[in-house]
Amino acid sequence: LSHSPLRRVARLSAATALCSGLALSAALAAPSAFGATTAPTPAVTAPAVVDLSITDALALLESGATTSVALTQRYLDRIAAYDDPYGDQPGLAAVILANPEALSTAAALDAERAAGTIRGPLHGIPILVKDNYATFDMPTTAGSASLHTYQTKLDSTAVERLRAAGAIILAKTNMSEFAWHGTYTLSSERGRTNNPYNQANSASGSSGGTGAAVAAGYAPAGLGTDTCGSIVGPSAHQSLVGYRPTMGLTSVTGIVPLSPRQDVSGPMTTTVTDAALLMEVLAGYDPTDPLTVIADEQDSSAYVEGLSDTALEGKRIGYVQWDYEEDPARPGLTETTALIDQAVRDLAAQGAEIVPVPTFTREFVSDTLVSGGYLDMRPSIDSFFATTEATWPDGLAALTEPVDALTFSDVMKDGKTSLLPEDVEFFESNEDIPNPAYDAAIAAQDAGKIAMDQFFVDNDLDALAMPTSATSAAPDWAGTTFCDVGANTGVPTVSLPAGFTSTGAAAGLELAAPRSQDAALLAMSYDYEQATLHRVAPASTPELPVTEPTPQPTAEPTAEPTAEPTVEPTAEPTATAVPVVPAPSATPTATAKPTAALAHTGTEGTTGLAALAFALVAGGAGALALTATRRRTAQK
């Protein structure tokens, strides 16, 4: 496949830079209760961010030790440093697009904080989202180069809730094209995402971009979607907490679907506390998503409050133990099994009763817990295009009939896909729904849901424990073993860090709980996490140099909190070079295409816009401009 790179450059004017600087200078000097103060404000520095949790970042922001601008610049610096090839590493290729408005949004949120306004529990926190979440200010590609300029008018419900809670949407992450492959992340829009624990290995999929990015410290947390393993798989293989909630607890409105019978939205984080916090923001009824009618069955407002390091005491947990065959292409079976055995002993040490579940067999999973999805993919994608107000790429809809409607077939006809021919054939074999085959599959899946619910009751279980993946990440494969349990039945599941093999490959413990017992599952997960603390950050993406605190000017806020930033027009694309990144040998080769964060506003390690604000207020800036560089490549 040949690639023609496109580069789009968005330049902010000197006036915009000045406004941002003044807004930030206001944010750095909160008003005294007795009027103006002449005392210097505390120095602000860009903090170390490797494994910085959301709760850690909030504490720094609340104390005034850092600002959202400094924090955002720090994360953008990491994307710039590690996403494209560097040193002897191929780079992660985890980000499709860094938000050109991230720094200006951060400055606005800093000003709001200084003025005493806090939007919500994520105020000023940068968050990553998978590139199938619609965003009003950035294109949504679902990993397809053909959708490079597909721009929705509105945010997805999940992104809307993040923004309402005060989050900064930092970047859109790479994904398996149309979320199809769950063992690797490869897209025509960005190429292959690599695992930061060993960049020769797969990052799993389909949310591998979010997984690799969060693991590497591009942001404290991110969102993925999961149809069968796409949150828990990348989380297990990159030592993260990956939470797949009860089906219907979180809205999927505005997310490019794969199979709506199984699609969920959920968090990928470095701590259980952060996962619980994000679930409080994401969970809840959405009138545009009928499946969320079940969201009101549980109180999702106290997930964090309910976390306890004694939650496992007295819990009855079934340990699923199957025999597996050694496969040279999927290494680590023996060591992963030992790690999961130890994880289960750790559950017991925290007071859980571990019981065998001999009736939870392969046959029970394959014959009873069946999927009703994968017969609705093509029609569901077509429905998304038909019902989502968006600007389509020029000429794309006219490639197939009907010429006035954008369809999955149009995207495939454009010829830029990384999907295999047999994948495309399977998508397009899906008949319009309803149809008899689909109705029969749904009926069988509904019966499996009842059987799963009854299994928990009959065995008096609070949870099931199993390996997220029985084997380790490899160059061509990093999958899951038990994704069917949550995906096909809709019960909540979580992958938790369970240690590392002798080769440094991460392992994950998967827990599944009864339907709508999300609070209990999060609490049990927290107890296990606090007792084990397995997570270690990857060595291939170390902390960047941290500068000494930068003295900040003293000023009173002179303006009301700034409005939501508008999207700036972008310049015409220009060509850039395309780095070559190894792709899995068993899958179509596609080079990782260059991305870019917002350009640095100073030397490496400075506080970016904070330093710019200081220079502006001090009168030494003149006509400075911020340059936001966006580089993505389109296949042709």
Where are these regions (language model features)?
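Short, well-ordered alpha-helical
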Residues: 37-141, 145-148, 179-182, 294-295, ...
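Short helix-loop capping/hinge segments that flank enzyme active sites or metal/cofactor-binding pockets
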Residues: 123-142, 311-320, 375-450, 497-506
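Structural helix-boundary/capping segments
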Residues: 216-321, 346, 488-553
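Glycine-rich, small-residue loops and helix-cap segments
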Residues: 64, 124, 422-549
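Extracellular Ser/Thr-rich, low-complexity/disordered mucin-like segments
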Residues: 577-614
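Short glycine/serine-rich loop/turn segments
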Residues: 85, 122-265, 290-293, 320-322, ...
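C-terminal membrane-anchoring or membrane-association module
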Residues: 613-636
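Gly/Ser-rich, acidic/histidine-flanked active-site/gating loops
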Residues: 133, 264, 291-378, 382-390
